[in-house]
Design a protein with these regions (language model features):
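Recognition helix of helix-turn-helix/homeodomain-like DNA-binding domains
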Residues: 26-42
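A detector for short, charged/polar N-terminal pre-domain segments
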Residues: 1-5, 72
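DNA major-groove recognition helix of helix-turn-helix
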Residues: 36, 47, 66
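DNA major-groove recognition helix of helix-turn-helix/homeodomain DNA-binding modules
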Residues: 26, 46-61
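Conserved hydrophobic/aromatic packing and binding residues within compact polymer-binding modules
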Residues: 7, 21-22, 32-35, 62
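Short basic helix-loop element that most often maps to the first helix and adjoining turn
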Residues: 5-24, 50
């Protein structure tokens, strides 16, 4: 499974639309569509980290370096409360 397929799979598991994922990471739904279809140029750097965070998987999983989508560690509650 390639990067785009993994993004698509995890987005569907989270019951998110392309628009919702795009809004969560600050890109258009067209960008998410292109990423899922294999145009990885749009997914470099900060977008990969943001997608992993929103989808609650490691960047290594999205990049195909790990086979299992291990969830990320939750942020400490006090840090989340300070940011909100």
């Amino acid at each position: 499974m390639n990067f785009g397929e993994r993004v698509h799979l995890m987005r569907r598991r989270k019951k998110m639309t392309q628009k919702e994922l795009g809004e969560a990471i600050g890109v258009s739904k067209t960008t998410i569509f292109r990423i899922e279809k294999g145009d990885f140029a749009d997914a470099m750097g900060q977008h990969i980290a943001k997608m992993a965070r929103v989808l609650n998987v490691s960047a290594d999983y999205l990049l195909g370096l790990k086979e299992e989508p291990a969830p990320l560690e939750p942020e400490p509650r006090e840090q989340v409360e300070q940011e909100g």
